[in-house]
From Swiss-Prot:
Component of the ISW2 complex, which at least consists of ISW2, ITC1, DLS1 and DPB4. This is Protein DLS1. Its main location: nucleus. It is found in: Nucleus. Transmembrane segments: none annotated.
Length: 167
């Protein structure tokens, strides 16, 4: 038959399979509280769609990174590495906004020092002497722990209360 099929495809032998494991896609879907019974073909389609989504996001991020590196004087490296900032920048600057829905999931990072200087974040550290640290861990679990960084993301500038004062 010249390696041609006679028009019949067997359900057990797909033409191609996704690179992502379908079983993991099923497991993730079944963890959703709104999960409904779904066919195996739908899970395969979801795996293919996820692969395509990851490819688009990676391509956009690499393209954005290459544009930024071309503006710099040093030559481009042979190997490119994507960072979180590259991906979040690609999401923010997506050409037609097709990645904007990811803004809440992958937000841009902000420099803590700049936020403190702008008075948008209160940043305090407290260091305890070693003998108090030991007693705090052994005797009292509710005592303040050493080197605790308190960040108050409250945008109210007129509110001068500290997070520890509210307890």
């Amino acid at each position: 038959m010249n390696n041609e099929t006679s028009g019949k495809e067997t359900a057990s032998a797909p033409l191609c399979s996704p690179k992502l494991p379908v079983e993991k896609v099923q497991r993730i879907a079944k963890n959703d509280p709104e999960y409904m019974d779904t066919s195996d073909d739908a899970f395969v389609a979801t795996a293919f769609a996820t692969e395509f989504f990851v490819q688009v996001l990676t391509h956009e991020s690499l393209h954005r990174q290459q544009q930024q590196q071309q503006q710099q004087v040093p030559p481009l490296p042979d190997e490119l590495t994507l960072s979180y900032d590259d991906i979040s920048a690609a999401i923010v600057h997506s050409s037609d906004g097709h990645l904007q829905f990811l803004n809440d999931v992958i937000p841009t990072t902000k420099n803590l020092r700049l936020l403190v200087e702008e008075n948008r974040v209160r940043y305090t550290t407290s260091v305890m002497p070693p003998n108090e640290v030991y007693s705090a861990y052994v005797v009292n679990d509710t005592a303040p722990k050493p080197n605790i960084v308190e960040i108050d993301l409250d945008n109210d500038e007129d509110d001068d209360e500290d997070v520890t004062d509210q307890e």
